[in-house]
């Protein structure tokens, strides 16, 4: 069954996230032009097949990640595979960028190999991925050199597209675009927005002193640093070293010493930037053992049942943010999509990123359909980067000049006594 692709989410100004509301259909048009003048690397990049266009995804397909990526892949395949555009049929290929050696998480060598494989396929037009921001750092430059557009349903690290003081690294994002043009877009909010929204939420709960931790990966560090920066601005005292985030060792077997240090700091809230696979279950358990009543807050990197299964009862009372709209909060046509999904999946809700996988595929399909030459990489790239007011299951998608989604929402949830967490509110942040 091919599910409806129309949904809605209200756009808002930067750092002001409004509640979601439906749009009545709307157009599915997207116009190119945001990519600028055609660079040399994008000349003569027409596919060689007379009847096939290839679209790839590169996502972690092992370990705890499958809770999200199984449904992401399902939606991408359902939206794209077998679609006919003029003389061409779209073929979709599901690539795994994880490995057993990396514990089922993304593996840099595998991600690079995936990007190189796709770059070498003359009929490849779109690369959907990555799931992890650190992986995107490796593949964006490879695909940029090959004039292949990349659309991420889940990358949230700001440095992939823009410079954010105190969060991004020197040279970012320019270093990822050796061809001097942009070939990367994402349909999800960035961590500077999510972190700031989370800090505002903590302030609204009366929290005054915070200890901030991260898993030292690109996503976790960026989100935690963003939270700490905004917390300092709004009067929450950040008591972790240097008033910023502190990395924890994901390979540690005991976080009791970390917990005692935090307890001694007098913090009344702990913020953790991490993905599930970074030993988060053990970390939560040790923190709760030392501080049963302390508030713990985190982001969408642990917004999955696998995290809760690992943390057990220690996960109860955790506050979570998601850089988008959770499936339980989509309205109008978006809710119709959720209802259809549930009907086909034993009444189970989609995972948090499922709708954003669908939206990424919708952007890709729209660009291919509207390209002057649908099997020309530059024409497809222009269509993606110039996406404007495109209806999708998460609402109207528009990309700015950096490739970031315009507007959006940050939603807040609380884990009470079981999974899934309960919706609290749509968060607002004003700088």
Give the positions of each predicted feature.
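Short, low-complexity disordered leader/linker segments with a strong preference
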Residues: 1-54, 85, 429-431
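Beta-alpha junction/loop-to-helix N-cap segments that form part of ligand/metal-binding clefts
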Residues: 28, 40-41, 67-72, 84-171, ...
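Extracytoplasmic "Venus flytrap"
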Residues: 36-77, 83, 95-108, 131-132, ...
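Periplasmic-binding protein-like
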Residues: 57, 118-131, 149-154, 209-214, ...
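Solvent-exposed loop/turn segments at secondary-structure junctions
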Residues: 60-64, 97-102, 132-137, 155-160, ...
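Extracellular/periplasmic Venus flytrap/periplasmic-binding protein
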Residues: 104, 117-120, 169-290, 328-332, ...
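Extracellular/periplasmic periplasmic-binding protein-like sensory domains
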Residues: 284-358, 416-429
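Segments of small-molecule ligand-sensing domains
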Residues: 343-354, 365-420
């Amino acid at each position: 069954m091919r599910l409806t692709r129309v949904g809605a989410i209200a756009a808002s100004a930067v750092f002001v996230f409004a509640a979601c509301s439906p749009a009545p259909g709307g157009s599915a048009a997207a116009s190119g032009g945001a990519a600028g003048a055609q660079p040399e690397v994008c000349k003569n990049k027409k596919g060689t097949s007379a009847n096939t266009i290839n679209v790839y995804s590169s996502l972690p397909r092992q370990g705890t990640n499958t809770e999200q990526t199984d449904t992401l892949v399902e939606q991408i395949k359902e939206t794209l595979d077998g679609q006919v555009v003029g003389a061409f049929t779209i073929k979709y290929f599901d690539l795994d960028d994880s490995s057993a050696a990396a514990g089922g998480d993304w593996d840099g060598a595998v991600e690079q190999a995936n990007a190189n494989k796709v770059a070498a396929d003359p009929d490849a037009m779109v690369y959907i991925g990555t799931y992890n921001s650190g992986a995107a750092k490796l593949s964006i430059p490879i695909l940029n050199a090959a004039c292949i557009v990349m659309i991420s349903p889940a990358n949230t690290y700001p440095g992939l597209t823009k410079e954010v003081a105190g969060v991004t690294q020197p040279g970012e994002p320019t270093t990822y675009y050796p061809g001097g043009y942009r070939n990367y877009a994402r349909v999800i909010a960035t961590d500077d927005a999510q972190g700031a929204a989370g800090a505002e939420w903590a302030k609204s709960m009366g929290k005054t002193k915070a200890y901030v931790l991260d898993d030292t990966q690109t996503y976790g560090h960026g989100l935690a640093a963003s939270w700490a920066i905004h917390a300092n601005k709004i009067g929450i005292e950040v008591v972790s070293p240097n008033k910023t985030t502190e990395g924890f060792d994901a390979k540690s077997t005991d976080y009791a010493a970390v917990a005692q240090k935090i307890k001694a700091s007098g913090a009344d809230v702990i913020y953790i930037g991490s993905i599930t696979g970074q030993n988060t279950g053990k970390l939560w358990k040790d923190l709760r053992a030392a501080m049963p009543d302390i508030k713990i807050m985190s982001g969408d990197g642990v917004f999955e049942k696998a995290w809760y299964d690992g943390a057990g009862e220690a996960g109860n009372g955790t506050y979570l943010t998601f850089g988008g709209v959770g499936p339980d909060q989509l309205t109008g046509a978006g809710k119709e999509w959720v209802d259809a999904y549930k009907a086909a999946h034993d009444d189970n809700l989609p995972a948090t990123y499922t709708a954003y996988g669908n939206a990424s595929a919708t952007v890709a399909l729209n660009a291919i359909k509207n390209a002057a030459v649908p099997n020309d990489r530059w024409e497809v790239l222009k269509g993606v980067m110039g996406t404007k007011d495109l209806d999708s299951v998460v609402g109207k998608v528009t990309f700015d000049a950096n490739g970031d989604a315009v507007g959006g929402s940050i939603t807040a949830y609380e884990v009470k006594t079981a999974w899934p967490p309960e919706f609290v509110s749509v968060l607002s942040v004003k700088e």
